[in-house]
């Protein structure tokens, strides 16, 4: 019988051996193309690392003194290296302490107010800023969020209503937007078709049940006498579908804007 090391070198005979004996499932029995000596042999023992004095022994030597520390280290290990190391350590320790002290006193360039308010109070100034800059920075933290919300609040409400205007006469969906636009803007030409659409929407709600559209027309178009006449005529005509009503109302509104322009074709399509 071959040893598992020889089987690992051959690589071909390892497969039947893995099925025969259970001990072949280890790394040695497998055919590996890596030099396994890099990971260390399990049978051989690694060389023990050299003995070093723990940190608490060095601290005891520092407190007692350099002479006593060298005598203890030489008695424990019996080597000259420990005496030289223990004698050289006191020169390095004060440098480490000085480094830590310098780190604690170094100025930081981050805004320390994020971690909490300073006990000094209103002292926002740094060594690189002037006194006037510190006051400006303190005031800027609060002024921007308060002013734009109050001043610019009505403007975004009006802009979407103006964008809905071209689609207003052809669709019956933006009814609420047309009512709010009627109250907000009075001197523009755009409210005229919107107010007619409002009257048309009221007739839409009342016509299918009552069958008399002219009764609701005078209520909405009361302040205007000459203009409700064409809309009233178109509503009195015998129509069945609500789409036809919307078309008939939109037709007289377009010639009033432009005398010779004819725009009844897009709604019919």
Curated annotation (Swiss-Prot):
The residues that cross the membrane are none
Pfam families (UniProt xref): RITA
Q: Give me the stretches of Low complexity compositional bias.
A: 79-93
Molecular function as annotated in GO: tubulin binding
User: Where is the segment annotated Interaction with tubulin?
Assistant: 156-269
The record's listing under InterPro entries reads: RITA1 (IPR031418)
Relate the assembly described in the record.
Interacts with RBPJ/RBPSUH.
Name recorded for this polypeptide: RBPJ-interacting and tubulin-associated protein 1
Q: What is the lineage of its organism?
A: Eukaryota, Metazoa, Chordata, Craniata, Vertebrata
């Amino acid at each position: 019988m071959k040893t598992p090391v020889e089987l690992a070198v051959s690589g071909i005979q390892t497969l039947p051996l893995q099925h025969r004996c259970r001990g072949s499932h280890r790394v040695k029995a497998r055919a590996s193309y890596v030099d396994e000596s890099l990971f260390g042999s399990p049978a051989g023992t690694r060389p023990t690392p050299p003995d070093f004095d723990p940190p608490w022994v060095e601290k005891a030597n520092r407190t007692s003194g350099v002479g006593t520390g060298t005598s203890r280290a030489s008695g424990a290990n019996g080597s000259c290296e420990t005496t030289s190391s223990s004698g050289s350590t006191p020169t390095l320790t004060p440098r480490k302490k000085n480094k830590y002290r310098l780190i604690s006193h170094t100025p930081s360039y981050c805004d320390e107010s994020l971690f909490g308010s300073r006990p000094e109070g209103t002292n926002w100034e740094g060594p690189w800023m002037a006194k006037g800059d510190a006051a400006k920075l303190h005031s800027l933290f609060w002024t921007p969020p308060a002013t734009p919300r109050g001043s610019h609040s009505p403007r975004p409400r009006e802009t979407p209503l103006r964008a809905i205007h071209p689609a207003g006469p052809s669709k019956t969906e933006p009814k609420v937007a047309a009512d709010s636009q009627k109250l907000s803007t009075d001197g523009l030409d755009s409210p005229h078709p919107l107010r007619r659409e409002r009257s048309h929407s009221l007739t839409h709600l009342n016509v299918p049940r009552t069958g008399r559209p002219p009764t609701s027309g005078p209520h909405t178009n009361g302040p205007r006498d000459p203009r409700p006449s064409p809309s009233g005529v178109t509503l009195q005509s015998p129509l069945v579908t609500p789409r036809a009503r919307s078309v008939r109302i939109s037709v007289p509104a377009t010639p009033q804007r432009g005398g010779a322009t004819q725009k009844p074709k897009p709604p019919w399509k």
